[in-house]
């Protein structure tokens, strides 16, 4: 569409019905009034209706024997799998539209520029940074939106500075070559000073990256699907060098040549390998794990302080306290008169004082045992992001997450949780806070968990407010845990972006020192 289009009764990916909505100019409009309507519906409809008879049989089998008639996914649509914002419009649109044509990307790589930069919302920006660092070019990333020389650069934008690379005479040509390979737009910036309070090129928001030196554990004991799609993603989306290490030999090899190690979903790791990895992480390494490997690393034999839900009920109040800090940190309503009053306020309210009916440890265990019976099979749930964290560069505020019977991660305040399950939706009709198992939801909010597929109400309650992605500093390094498999079948491009951020940006943004060869 060439202009903004105002429409009515639009369905969001969250399932909300919005009475009045404006489709921004430049959106892709796919009409369903055409011969391929059945195919379009099959690949783009947000939700597929499951027959009541099927739901009855599935629930009965789950309760009776713990079995299921579902395959490994009960949800699929392109926009959610790809992490794209989309809406369903219930009316035919025909004004301000033109036939879509693939547009060529234009780059202005001017020799005398002080900075060359690319937009961080483009997933190819991660590969742009990776391929330049592969050629030993110093690269920076902007962690807060700025405007330089009239160009708006959102957080996550990649910048190459002339002054960082004084000895590279053909820097301009290298930038141009990589941008052409990736078909990504690059802008040339003549001044590094942001207007007013926006970041400048010499400030703390222009952070220097570290060249990733990547290894992935594989071979016996690992899920071949997860190994394969992770390997493919490294090749296809980044196109830089990496090593495959036989996990049985990891404890005998020299890991110092790597600063990033990926552990795909797999079996438990022996004690000696765990000790080797812990020592490597403490020296500045970035360890990234998926699904079953995450399940092991969050056990009593693993690494770090992230725990699984079933092991936290004796400290549920502490976890809820930290969660409330996180939620209330997003609030913008301040009573300025009370704040500036010199007299002490005797009516200050605290989040936990308003709660009624908190659950005991025994009740939490009983509920969890029951709710665990109904965990989903490949459904899509809503992930809310921390929009200030570097792991969420280039992602929407609500990221669709493919979820099944995964380890449910619990993080205290000293562990980052860049993605949690559940989209906060304002609802002014809710006047009191509500309890969801171990956690609580402040007044004035609803929580949307399900986006697509079969998610029983019990499962929604069980996974609500848990972490899908965590990042914890250990020594000089860090451990990054994905509850699921971020590259499922190479199709979940939304969560794949989180994974690529972890690999390429982790060594520079999340660690304190280098792994020295």
Report residues per predicted region.
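Intrinsic-disorder/low-complexity accessory segments
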Residues: 1-517
